[in-house]
Amino acid sequence: MSWDQVWIDINIATMSPNISEPYGAIRDAALAVKDGKIAWIGKRCDLPEFDVLATPIYKGKNGWLTPGLIDAHTHLVFAGNRANEFELRLQGASYEEIARNGGGIISTVNACREADEAELFELGRQRLNALAKEGVTTVEIKSGYGLDIETELKILRVARELGKHHHVDVKTTFLGAHAIPPEYKNDSDAYVDLVINEMLPQVIAENLADAVDVFCENIAFSLAQTERVLTAAKNAGLDIKLHAEQLSNLGGSEMAAKLGAKSVDHIEYLDEDGVKALSESGTCATLLPGAFYFLRETQLPPIELLRQYKVPMVVASDYNPGSSPLCSSLLMLNMACTLMRLTPEEALAGMTRNAAKALGIEAEVGVLETGMTADFCLWNISTPAELSYTYGVGSCIEVVKNGRLVHQ
Ligand code: NIG
Ligand code: FE
């Protein structure tokens, strides 16, 4: 056998559904990499003979390998911050009131319109570094803090550039319909026209987005407006997804599922009909515990129904300055368990296998199996549940991306 690298003295949480052990675990395992892919994975005692003198061998000190983490929902390219709104909320103002009074998303829009690409890139790079340190190897980044053609394109270009210059892979999502900009305050339909007829074609022409998202909510876009944007995106061949049922139930998830959305995200107010629709269409349910925590929500997403209907649950950071200023994926694993009562195994599946599905990249990443991309992390832990049990101890000790060891 001729391999580029071999890992031994490891246990592996493959997260493969084809291995019946919890976490798809293989204890006393070995893994071999060739040309950026997993060439062999299994029990150490079954490892075929290979040229030990010509092959770099990495010893995992009996820690655990997991798939590289995938943060499938972030807004990490933005300028400014909203600490002032945090203070207002602690004095009693609600997230919705602040948004209705011209703060919220619009205040970040103002900061992004003023920032140049270099500034946004540097801010984004620092945030990507923070996620990468915790074992994230793929991230989704949304626009949505521009709300005019120039700034929406600027944010998406920066997101694409980050993907080119950082080892973390970046999937981009056009979220032009994130909020109604002040210029269209009294004519939101005209803004939706702009998103569909002018922004979307330019985003497509420059190949700036892999998917399209909308914020379907009383303080943002109606069900009918959301359907128009998602239909246009789908017709253009892009993946679709939705911020839905975060503060109320407008039926967005059900509609998006019927259009074949990859995921619906937040979904605190989703009901059983909605869950059924997700299960029928294979749409993922993305749980965002950071926003749930930071907005001090009390309405939990319908976790038990999602389990019952076997809807794949995704866990993501939703990193953004307003509702989840928490740039940590591992913290989300902990919160998914403590606040939303996922099992540690469900939480990890939400940041690996199911997150890959939500981004449409499940054929390449998200589980450790032969033929998959060699994106994985070595953790200094004695059981995979430790990933969501403890936080802040820096247990990610090595990251391999596309078969290359990344020095962090
Ligand atoms: O995912 N819900 C809408 N959008 C973001 C929040 C954006 C903001 O407040 O800046 C979210 O929570
Ligand atoms: Fe979000």
Swiss-Prot record:
GO function terms (MF aspect): imidazolonepropionase activity; iron ion binding; zinc ion binding
Cofactor comment: Binds 1 zinc or iron ion per subunit.
EC number: 3.5.2.7
Cofactor(s) required, per the database record: Zn(2+); Fe(3+)
Residues that hold Fe(3+) according to the record: 73, 75, 243, 318
Catalytic activity: 4-imidazolone-5-propanoate + H2O = N-formimidoyl-L-glutamate
GO biological process: L-histidine catabolic process to glutamate and formamide; L-histidine catabolic process to glutamate and formate
List of residues binding Zn(2+): 73, 75, 243, 318
Entries under Gene3D superfamilies matching the protein: Metal-dependent hydrolases (3.20.20.140), Urease, subunit C, domain 1 (2.30.40.10)
Location relative to the cell: Cytoplasm
Catalytic class of the enzyme: hydrolase
Keyword terms: Cytoplasm, Histidine metabolism, Hydrolase, Iron, Metal-binding, Zinc
SUPFAM superfamilies listed in its UniProt record: Composite domain of metallo-dependent hydrolases, Metallo-dependent hydrolases
A GO cellular component annotation in the UniProt record: cytoplasm
InterPro entries: Amidohydro-rel (IPR006680), HutI (IPR005920), Metal-dep_hydrolase_composite (IPR011059), Metal_Hydrolase (IPR032466)
Annotated positions binding N-formimidoyl-L-glutamate: 145, 320, 322
Binding site for 4-imidazolone-5-propanoate: 82, 145, 178, 246, 323
Protein's pathway: Amino-acid degradation; L-histidine degradation into L-glutamate; N-formimidoyl-L-glutamate from L-histidine: step 3/3
Family: Belongs to the metallo-dependent hydrolases superfamily. HutI family.
HAMAP family documented for this protein: HutI
Task performed by this protein: Catalyzes the hydrolytic cleavage of the carbon-nitrogen bond in imidazolone-5-propanoate to yield N-formimidoyl-L-glutamate. It is the third step in the universal histidine degradation pathway.
Protein name: Imidazolonepropionase
Protein source organism: Shewanella piezotolerans (strain WP3 / JCM 13877)
Gene that encodes the chain: hutI
